Amino acid sequence: MKLLVLCIFAMMATLAMSRRWNFVTPREVNKAFEVALKVQIIAGFDRTLVKWLRAHGRSLSHVQKKALYFVNRRYMQTHWANYMLWVNKKIDALGRTAVVADYTRLGAEIGRRIDMDYFYNFLKGRNMIPKYLPYMEEINRMRSADIPIRYRGK
């Protein structure tokens, strides 16, 4: 029982720290900048997935492969606020007004640096690839630039 309580407190402290001590107000980003980020992040994730499928995807069905493409898009949507914190820090460090090429470069860096191979191996190894549903098809059919995101800040 003591161990359970200790684990719960540790989890609460971890969540509190991941949300920061103070509220960071979200900064709205120009649509062109947002599109540049999304396109490059998804391109990087999809490039990683194609390489991974060549090496490990022989046993996966076509539907499971499509579900992994959805995982890429959902991962980007889920972590968008964290990406924006990092992007805002990098843009502020430039010391000049940002242009689309800056956001394109940062989006490509995010897509390249995040180790999605780990997630694909985790999902495949534990047979946790999600069942492909109609809403997944809708998001997969969208262009990278049109994938909806919500930035509420952290």
Swiss-Prot record:
The keyword Nucleus does not apply. It comes from the Eukaryota. Sperm. SUPFAM superfamilies: Fertilization protein. Pfam families: Egg_lysin. Keywords: Fertilization, Signal. InterPro entries: Egg_lysin, Egg_lysin_sf. The keyword Calcium does not apply. This is Egg-lysin. The lineage of its organism: Eukaryota, Metazoa, Spiralia, Lophotrochozoa, Mollusca.
